[in-house]
Amino acid sequence: MTAQVLVAQHVVAGYAPGLPIVQDASVEVGPGEIVTIVGPNGAGKSTLLKAIAGEVLFESGTILLDGRDVAGLPAHEMVRCGIGFVPQTGNVFTNLTVAENLVVGGHILPRAELKRRLARAYELTPFLGERRASTGRLLSGGQRQILAVARALMTDPKVIMLDEPTAGLAPRAAGEVFAHLRRLAGTGVAVLMVEQNAKAAIRASDRFYVLAQGRNRMQGRPQDLADDTAIGEAFLGRGKASS
């Protein structure tokens, strides 16, 4: 069995000491795999990603990246360790060109390495190369999200995490984002995302987790689902908590 790139176990995290939003959540993702976390509003999905990325208060649990314990490291150290994080807004600078946005993502790189990774970004996502001189405001919503992903990839992460990458997008644009993530996973990058559109996201994934009330309620593979009943129960917190 291929070793998992990211293993987070029994994570407790939040925004203030003693007030955890994530109360006991676990997730794993392997190389070239797309894993999605779904659940109701307030379940702790985004907070779990931010805890792994070092952006909120980590209270307890284990986070291993290629076997190395990185739990509790600050965000800038997580980037250096190999975690890329795309927040819900994408944070594309609409006044900057596509090329300038990518340079921002790789600002810590030596000049020669930055040039090499720009070329790789354009190879993986040809339309970015074609529109490298266009500003972010001229891109569609789906294209901006793909640019945000490409920018996070400039540091060559082992795993890329995305917080609701299709939020606010029309179904066609959302499908383009999911298709891009599948191509990305095909290069060996581990993909972990949080999504509100559970049905579409699960279909686009290799595995999924359902969180409710800050805890794991269900996990599985899309092909194992006979219908939506079990997921609905898990959303309501009726599923058996699992690690």
PLM-predicted stretches and their roles:
Residues 61-68, 81, 114-118, 220:
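Conserved ABC transporter NBD signature motif
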Residues 38-40:
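The feature captures the beta-strand-to-loop junction immediately N-terminal to the Walker
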Residues 152-153:
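ABC ATPase C-loop
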Residues 135-139:
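Conserved ABC ATPase signature
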Residues 160-164:
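Catalytic Walker B motif of ABC-type/P-loop ATPase nucleotide-binding domains
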Residues 1-8, 12-24, 31, 36, ...:
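A short, flexible loop at the N-terminus of ABC-type nucleotide-binding domains that lies
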Residues 16-17, 98-116, 124-129, 133, ...:
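ABC-type ATPase nucleotide-binding domains, specifically the catalytic core motifs of the NBD
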